[in-house]
């Protein structure tokens, strides 16, 4: 009897689960990077499916910059409690001691010290030899050319000219001591795939993805949410309440909201079918300079 043909989402799911299982079997000390966003939520769901009814056999790591939305941190802790996975958090102590923040030091320095350096500290501290990330190739041009198994040297740096071939879904995970692999099981998914899968699987998300009235400040043509008392207003700025949602999440001073009436999954999917702009246009760190994402990844960024 002929086998049942898999749907597009089922094919993506099967591929991702196979990658997750292969990494768990092949590497000595893997970890899943958990940024709390929609892609991380899908990746967590896939990991739970991959090892059901057992528990996820590796920890989740959140690199906390201290500037995430309050709702993100509350959601992170609630998910860890609900599903019982091991959650590791790390904040760069040197950055905290220096008082590094996105307002006074700018997005580039804040991101480098609190995210890139913080991530490298955590990977070194625990000795992880593989780290899952939720990046997708459709997000940004430097990610479009990255392999599923992305080799990193002893300093966690990525060299786009020194990548390994991946033929017929055959992945090379061989590393020497101190080297590691970043693994991207969602590489072949699109933003629309992510949202349709979230709808199909009824995956919980941070409420910030859904339209609601929120306090925002308009700055350089972008809407920045005033998430707490640390929000610094520039001359002539005022907080106003607008119906907005977030297409992508990060540190709140560096993440722009968008006007939207999409307050449920069906409306978000409809919005995605009509949009012609990149989801990362709301990430202010991507506009630091030309090719900034590739430069960050070369230095060890996610």
Curated annotation (Swiss-Prot):
Keywords: ATP-binding, Nucleotide-binding, Nucleotidyltransferase, Transferase
GO biological process, one term: sulfate assimilation
Pathway per the UniProt entry: Sulfur metabolism; hydrogen sulfide biosynthesis; sulfite from sulfate: step 1/3
Reaction equations catalysed: sulfate + ATP + H(+) = adenosine 5'-phosphosulfate + diphosphate
InterPro entries in alphabetical order: PAPS_reduct_dom, Rossmann-like_a/b/a_fold, SO4_adenylTrfase_ssu, Sulfate_adenylyltrnsfr_sub2
GO molecular function list: ATP binding; sulfate adenylyltransferase (ATP) activity
Chain positions covered by the region annotation Disordered: 280-302
Protein EC: 2.7.7.4
Pfam annotation, one family: PAPS_reduct
Function per UniProt: With CysN forms the ATP sulfurylase (ATPS) that catalyzes the adenylation of sulfate producing adenosine 5'-phosphosulfate (APS) and diphosphate, the first enzymatic step in sulfur assimilation pathway. APS synthesis involves the formation of a high-energy phosphoric-sulfuric acid anhydride bond driven by GTP hydrolysis by CysN coupled to ATP hydrolysis by CysD.
Family per similarity comment: Belongs to the PAPS reductase family. CysD subfamily.
Assembly and binders: Heterodimer composed of CysD, the smaller subunit, and CysN.
Name the record gives this protein: Sulfate adenylyltransferase subunit 2
Natural source organism: Shewanella oneidensis (strain ATCC 700550 / JCM 31522 / CIP 106686 / LMG 19005 / NCIMB 14063 / MR-1)
């Amino acid at each position: 009897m002929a086998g049942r043909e898999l749907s597009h989402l089922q094919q993506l799911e099967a591929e991702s689960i196979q990658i997750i299982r292969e990494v768990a079997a092949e590497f000595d000390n893997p970890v899943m990077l958990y940024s709390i966003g929609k892609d991380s939520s899908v990746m967590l769901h896939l990991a739970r499916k991959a090892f059901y009814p057992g528990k996820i056999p590796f920890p989740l790591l959140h690199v906390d910059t201290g500037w995430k939305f309050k709702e993100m941190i509350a959601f992170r802790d609630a998910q860890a409690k609900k599903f019982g996975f091991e959650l590791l958090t790390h904040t760069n102590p040197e950055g905290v001691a220096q008082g590094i923040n996105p307002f006074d030091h700018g997005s580039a320095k804040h991101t480098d010290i609190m995210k890139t350096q913080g991530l490298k500290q955590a990977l070194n501290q625990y000795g992880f030899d593989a780290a899952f990330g939720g990046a997708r190739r459709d997000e940004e041009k430097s990610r479009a050319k990255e392999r599923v198994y992305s080799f990193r040297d002893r300093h966690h740096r990525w060299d786009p000219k020194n990548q390994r071939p991946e033929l017929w879904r055959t992945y090379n995970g061989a590393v020497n001591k101190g080297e590691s692999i970043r693994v991207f099981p969602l590489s072949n998914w699109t933003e629309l795939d992510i949202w349709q899968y979230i709808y199909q699987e009824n995956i919980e998300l941070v409420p910030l993805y859904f339209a609601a009235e929120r306090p925002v400040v308009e700055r350089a043509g972008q809407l920045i949410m005033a998430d707490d008392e640390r929000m610094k207003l520039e001359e002539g700025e005022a907080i106003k309440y607008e119906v907005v949602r977030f297409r992508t999440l990060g540190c709140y001073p560096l993440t722009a909201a968008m006007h939207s009436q999409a307050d449920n999954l069906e409306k978000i999917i409809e919005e995605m079918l009509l949009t012609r702009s990149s989801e990362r246009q709301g990430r202010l760190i991507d506009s630091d300079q030309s090719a900034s994402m590739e430069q960050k990844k070369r230095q060890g960024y996610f």
